[in-house]
A protein has these predicted regions:
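Flavin-dependent oxidoreductase catalytic cores
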Residues: 1-117
Length: 117
């Protein structure tokens, strides 16, 4: 954030800082101290598309934050944008369901949900 602050002091336009913001407290700190005018949370949102809602409800960090594996970027040219880090999910099916959840209606038939045993 030191570099973002130096840039902000040198230019007369808004500065957006990137660099792995995943916690509400760090985002608030950067904005409150005037380090930058905004932050980019792209990968954090890809990993947890409800991150801002979690922050609004008082959570500082998502339960399974982005691991910075970059699999989202590696898959983006041929597959839907989403988190492909299987270790963040209980199963591959859960991962695929989250990735495909942006499509409404789903592009292919979904299996019927059964109650957990």
């Amino acid at each position: 954030m030191r570099d973002a602050y130096a840039i902000k002091q040198s230019v007369g336009i808004p500065v957006i800082c990137t660099g792995g913001f995943q916690t509400a407290s760090v985002v608030r700190d950067a904005l409150n101290r005037g380090v930058c005018d905004g932050v980019s949370i792209a990968r954090s949102l890809i990993a947890d598309n409800d991150l801002v809602e979690l922050w609004r409800r008082g959570y500082d960090r998502a339960p399974r934050p982005c691991t910075y594996c970059n699999k989202c970027l590696a898959n983006a040219t041929e597959n839907p944008l989403g988190c492909y880090e299987e270790s963040r999910f209980d199963s591959r099916e859960e991962m695929v369901a989250q990735i495909m959840s942006v499509f409404e209606p789903a592009p292919f038939p979904q299996p019927a949900m059964t109650p957990a045993e």
